[in-house]
């Protein structure tokens, strides 16, 4: 008799995705982040659900409802901090996952890659709206500043911003709709993630060498299930250390002050995972130019398959490209640091140089380096 997991219509899908899936024998721990992102998403949906049971999306009570969750709800504090820091872990995994894709040439699977870029945008939108919900000072002013950027769009900008706000400023209508969107988006992300996997399983996984692994496959279970469980345990360990020892490490103290439209905080800045993009936005002294650079800083990922000039897929055997990749990582860390600094000398010029370097590396230096490597190998 055939095993039920191979015949049952539902279990057959799960079996082909997580049990009998042929996987390359040499994929490293950099391939763990996909499953970790799935775990992060499930964790965020569950903690978010319990938070939504006690949260009120109203300007008069939002801030105090979050305080109520932390003080009066059984284990409310741990649910709240797991949700807030879970977002940070989510973005750490996202950046690692995208970085892995860039390094090993995973963007050659164009459908998978493009869905991934859409997933990145959707996750960033969700995190932004979630940051507005506690209705602290940074929530309010962050929402005001970021939504205001849309007013830079010619002709329709102002109308668009007022339409998103549901009025002439960030107010009750804005908070209510942001809560509604913040609740629905993770489910859209989950659906997109399934499409992401669907496209991935059409081709199979890439591997560190970038060479076809069809000649050497192993079953996903038990080899990669156990590897994913180890990754998950390490992720949860890191998250719980953050939650239990320094839950406010990555937060902004200004968000413990209730939102006040009459008092602007001295330094308006987003959560740490948006700082690199915020630094690029600020480095251009023109509103529309800044907004375009901000969008392009992430949209540039879609161009990666077109910018790939090397005859090899992976960077594993390309030392010049490796150097440029790690310079890009250092550049992004520099931008993240600059995004959290006030707009004054020398931070302005450092931010501008780092922004130029970011686009220069991706659009010019890396494709040129790949061509040089081809010539060195006489290809």
Curated annotation (Swiss-Prot):
Biological process (GO), any one: mitochondrial electron transport, ubiquinol to cytochrome c
Binding site for heme b b566: 97, 196
Alphabetically ordered keywords of this record: Electron transport, Heme, Iron, Membrane, Metal-binding, Mitochondrion, Mitochondrion inner membrane, Respiratory chain, Transmembrane, Transmembrane helix, Transport, Ubiquinone
Membrane topology, from the record: Multi-pass membrane protein
GO CC list: mitochondrial inner membrane; respiratory chain complex III
Job description of the protein: Component of the ubiquinol-cytochrome c reductase complex (complex III or cytochrome b-c1 complex) that is part of the mitochondrial respiratory chain. The b-c1 complex mediates electron transfer from ubiquinol to cytochrome c. Contributes to the generation of a proton gradient across the mitochondrial membrane that is then used for ATP synthesis.
InterPro entries named among the record's database cross-references: Cyt_b/b6_C (IPR005798), Cyt_b/b6_C_sf (IPR036150), Cyt_b/b6_N (IPR005797), Cytb/b6-like_sf (IPR027387), Cytochrome_b (IPR030689), Cytochrome_b_C_euk/bac (IPR048260), Cytochrome_b_N_euk/bac (IPR048259), Di-haem_cyt_TM (IPR016174)
Co-factor(s): heme b
Sites where the protein binds a ubiquinone: 201
Underlying gene: MT-CYB
Further remark: Heme 1 (or BL or b562) is low-potential and absorbs at about 562 nm, and heme 2 (or BH or b566) is high-potential and absorbs at about 566 nm.
Name of the protein: Cytochrome b
Main location: mitochondrion
Location of the protein in the cell: Mitochondrion inner membrane
Residues that bind heme b b562: 83, 182
Membership in a protein family: Belongs to the cytochrome b family.
Top-level taxon: Eukaryota
SUPFAM superfamilies named among the record's database cross-references: a domain/subunit of cytochrome bc1 complex (Ubiquinol-cytochrome c reductase) (SSF81648), Transmembrane di-heme cytochromes (SSF81342)
Subunit structure: The cytochrome bc1 complex contains 11 subunits: 3 respiratory subunits (MT-CYB, CYC1 and UQCRFS1), 2 core proteins (UQCRC1 and UQCRC2) and 6 low-molecular weight proteins (UQCRH/QCR6, UQCRB/QCR7, UQCRQ/QCR8, UQCR10/QCR9, UQCR11/QCR10 and a cleavage product of UQCRFS1). This cytochrome bc1 complex then forms a dimer.
């Amino acid at each position: 008799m055939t095993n039920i997991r191979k015949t049952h219509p539902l279990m057959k899908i799960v079996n082909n995705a997580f049990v009998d899936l042929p996987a390359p024998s040499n994929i490293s721990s950099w391939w763990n982040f996909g499953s970790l992102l799935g775990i992060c998403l499930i964790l965020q949906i569950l903690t978010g659900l319990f938070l939504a049971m006690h949260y009120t999306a109203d300007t008069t009570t939002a801030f105090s409802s979050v305080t109520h969750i932390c003080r009066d709800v059984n284990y409310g504090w741990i649910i709240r901090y797991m949700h807030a820091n879970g977002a940070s872990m989510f973005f750490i995994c996202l950046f690692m996952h995208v970085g892995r894709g860039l390094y090993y040439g995973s963007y050659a699977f164009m459908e998978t890659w493009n869905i991934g870029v859409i997933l990145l945008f959707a996750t960033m939108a969700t995190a932004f709206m979630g940051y507005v919900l506690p209705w602290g000072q940074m929530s309010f002013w962050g929402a005001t500043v970021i939504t205001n950027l849309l007013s830079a769009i010619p002709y329709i900008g102002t109308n668009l911003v007022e339409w998103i706000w549901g009025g002439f400023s960030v107010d009750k209508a804005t908070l209510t709709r942001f809560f509604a969107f913040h609740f629905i988006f993770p489910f859209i992300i989950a659906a997109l993630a399934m499409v992401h996997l669907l496209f991935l399983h059409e081709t199979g996984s890439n591997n560190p060498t970038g060479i076809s692994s069809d000649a050497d496959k192993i079953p996903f279970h038990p080899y990669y299930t156990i590897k994913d469980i180890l990754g998950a345990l390490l992720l949860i360990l890191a998250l719980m250390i953050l939650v239990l020892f320094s839950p406010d490490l990555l937060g902004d103290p200004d968000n413990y002050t209730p939102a006040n439209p009459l008092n602007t905080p001295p330094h308006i800045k987003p959560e740490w995972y948006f700082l690199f993009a915020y630094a690029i936005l600020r480095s251009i002294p023109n509103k529309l130019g800044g907004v375009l650079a901000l969008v392009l800083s992430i949209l540039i990922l879609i161009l990666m398959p077109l910018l790939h000039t090397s005859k090899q897929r992976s960077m594993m055997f390309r030392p010049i490209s490796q150097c440029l990749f790690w310079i890009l990582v250092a550049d992004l860390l520099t931008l993240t640091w600059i995004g959290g600094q006030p707009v004054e000398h020398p931070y302005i010029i450092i931010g501008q140089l780092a922004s130029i370097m970011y686009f220069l590396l991706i659009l010019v230096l890396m494709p040129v380096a790949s061509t040089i490597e081809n010539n060195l190998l006489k290809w």
